[in-house]
């Protein structure tokens, strides 16, 4: 499966970033007509999965001391949404971390 990777720099504590990124990811999933989001945090890392436009999409989030990285695996049939997904994730996460 093709992968989308977005990394956003930050200067906040890992706990604060986790609290801010969670609603940003939830909003991004909703913006992409996503349903059935499963988001499982284990300290500074999360796995997620949701359905959108008939596709099952999964990925992970890694929060490091100076950056947060979101990896998204898209089915081949959803490749037409790759750039839109990348921009949507980058914008949502950056906005959440700016607040």
Regions found by a protein language model. Give the residues of each.
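Intrinsic-disorder/low-complexity, polar/charged segments enriched in Ser/Thr/Lys/Arg/Asp/Glu/Gln
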Residues: 1-5, 45, 67
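Feature captures hydrophobic
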Residues: 4, 27, 49, 92, ...
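C-terminal structural segments of small proteins and small subunits
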Residues: 7, 65-96
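Terminal, regulation- and interaction-focused segments at domain boundaries
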Residues: 1-20, 24-31, 35-36
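Intrinsically disordered, low-complexity acidic/polar segments
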Residues: 15, 57, 79-81
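A short, structured beta-strand/loop element
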Residues: 56-65
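Residue-level recognition of conserved beta-strand positions in structured domain cores
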Residues: 50, 61, 72-74
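Ser/Thr-rich, low-complexity intrinsically disordered terminal regions
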Residues: 23, 30-57
């Amino acid at each position: 499966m093709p992968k989308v990777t977005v990394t956003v720099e930050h200067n906040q504590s890992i706990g604060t970033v986790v609290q801010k990124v969670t609603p940003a990811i939830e909003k991004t999933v909703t913006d992409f007509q996503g349903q059935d989001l499963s988001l499982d945090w284990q300290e500074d890392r999360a796995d997620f999965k949701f359905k959108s436009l008939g596709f099952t999409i999964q990925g992970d989030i890694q929060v490091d001391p100076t950056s947060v990285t979101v990896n998204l695996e898209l089915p081949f049939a959803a490749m037409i949404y790759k750039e839109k997904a990348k921009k949507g994730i980058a914008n949502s996460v950056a906005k959440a971390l700016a607040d």
